[in-house]
Amino acid sequence: MLKSGLMDTDDQKVGVRVANIDMSERTDNVHLIEIRRIISLVGAAYFFFMTAWVVPVACVITVSLLFPLMLFSTPLFNYLEHKLCAMVNAHWNAVSVFVGATVTEYGTNLAGYAEEKCLLLANHLGLLDHFVLMQSLNGKGSIRSRWMWVIYNIWKYTPLGVMWTSHGNFFVNGGVSKRDSVLSSFRDHLKNSFYKYDYGWVIMYPEGSRLYLVKNSGRTFAEKNGLKPLDNCVYPRTGAAHAVLDVLGPTDDSLSMSKCGKGEPIKYIIDATIGYRKGAVPDICDVMMGDWESVEASQFAVHYDVIPVKPEWSDENLLKEFLYERYIIKDKLLAEFYKTGHFPGDKTKVIPNNYEMMFAQVFWGCLYYAHYVYWLRPLIVHSWTSFLSIF
């Protein structure tokens, strides 16, 4: 009886102690999660404000102040504007690193093509695609300073859109009815801007929109045209890519002059295949809060193939045939990636430059503050005073 009673008492004491320890650990874990949540919320608010307002406003005002330089030296203007563009990309990389995203590259090493004239065509899965490409290409020569993006015009009238316009990026409208007029404007833009402002790469998503928005219509298009339906991407729209090669493509196999006659032609097509683990594209709002479904979900990948441009691709039918073949290959690459977790070939993990990203935050913060003190605040005060004087 005594032994039994002692054992019961000890068990109860041990049970109480274990329960207390478990409850203490649970409380500590809850506090830790709450602290991390607060840090994520503060960080997300900071980077959203910087990305959506501070950087665009500071960049646009600075570029506007630089415009008079073009009366004296266009190369000097281009040099300074390209430096600003590089710092914009450094900030975007800081956002990627903050949320915990990593990028691994497969296929051809693009370092040797950084200073060439190239057309990069990427599949479009989600809003994070921009971060994947920006982080991947950031450390490769002057690409990040001298690229021209072709972007859907939903962003055009936002501060980001104004900033991208000031750099010379081109916005496209959807719809068949506007196709000819948009492509005509794009051709004019390429002729007037590409060489004048010393661009190097043109980057676009030829599928037209994010995959989940065009997957059904893409399958219908394939079936209607007797093509094999693709599962992981859709056949590209060739209009914009053809416009690039029709204006900037080579006149002959010597690759010495572009078709518009203004300089060195586009020599390479960069076929970029972006992949997310198991095909699940993370939501950008969840990502900003650090809410990843798994550790692997934050590990992005991109596969590069480099194809020399052929002069005959200025014929849209021949270009279409080539691009359709490439997207069949792309579909197979993505199928393998979703199955195995990696693309074929050697891989290289992109290492971000932490010092540059920290400097970018200081740079844009100080630049915005200077513009606010000397331009924005007086303008706001004057506008408000003028408005009140009406009444």
From Swiss-Prot:
Where does the chain cross the membrane? 47-67, 84-104
Short motif HXXXXD motif, span: 124-129
Q: Which InterPro entries match?
A: Acyltransf_C, Plipid/glycerol_acylTrfase
User: Is Hydrolase tagged as a keyword?
Assistant: no
Q: Which GO terms describe its biological process?
A: CDP-diacylglycerol biosynthetic process; IRE1-mediated unfolded protein response; PERK-mediated unfolded protein response; phosphatidylinositol acyl-chain remodeling
Q: How does it sit in the membrane?
A: Multi-pass membrane protein
List localization entries. Membrane
Known EC number(s)? 2.3.1.51
Q: Which reaction does it catalyse?
A: a 1-acyl-sn-glycero-3-phosphate + an acyl-CoA = a 1,2-diacyl-sn-glycero-3-phosphate + CoA
Q: What class of enzyme is it?
A: transferase
According to its UniProt entry, the function of this protein is described as: Converts lysophosphatidic acid (LPA) into phosphatidic acid by incorporating an acyl moiety at the sn-2 position of the glycerol backbone.
The similarity comment for this entry is: Belongs to the 1-acyl-sn-glycerol-3-phosphate acyltransferase family.
Record-given protein name? Putative 1-acyl-sn-glycerol-3-phosphate acyltransferase acl-12
Give the organism, scientific name.
Answer: Caenorhabditis elegans
- Gene responsible for this protein: acl-12
